[in-house]
């Protein structure tokens, strides 16, 4: 965080807006992908067991 604050103060208002938008988009994409992978693995195992029992 310290390095980013220093860059903002040097860059000014224009660079602040552009860099913040890119940082937020990149962070959201990375977090969503990581969380989806973990949840999908857990749900797949549970769905296979529950789905087979319910269908039979």
From Swiss-Prot:
Keywords: Chromosome, Developmental protein, Differentiation, DNA condensation, DNA-binding, Nucleosome core, Nucleus, Phosphoprotein, Spermatogenesis. P2 is phosphorylated in immature sperm. It is dephosphorylated in mature sperm allowing a stronger interaction with DNA. The keyword DNA-binding applies. Residues 1-56 are annotated as: Disordered. GO terms for cellular component: nucleosome; nucleus. Testis. It is found in: Nucleus; Chromosome. GO terms for molecular function: DNA binding. GO terms for biological process: cell differentiation; chromosome condensation; spermatogenesis. Protamines substitute for histones in the chromatin of sperm during the haploid phase of spermatogenesis. They compact sperm DNA into a highly condensed, stable and inactive complex. Octopus spermiogenesis is characterized by a double nuclear protein transition: Histones are first replaced by P1, which allows the chromatin to adopt a shape that is not as relaxed as with histones. The majority of P1 is later replaced by P2, forming a compact chromatin. P2 is the main protamine of sperm. This is Sperm protamine P1. The lineage of its organism: Eukaryota, Metazoa, Spiralia, Lophotrochozoa, Mollusca.
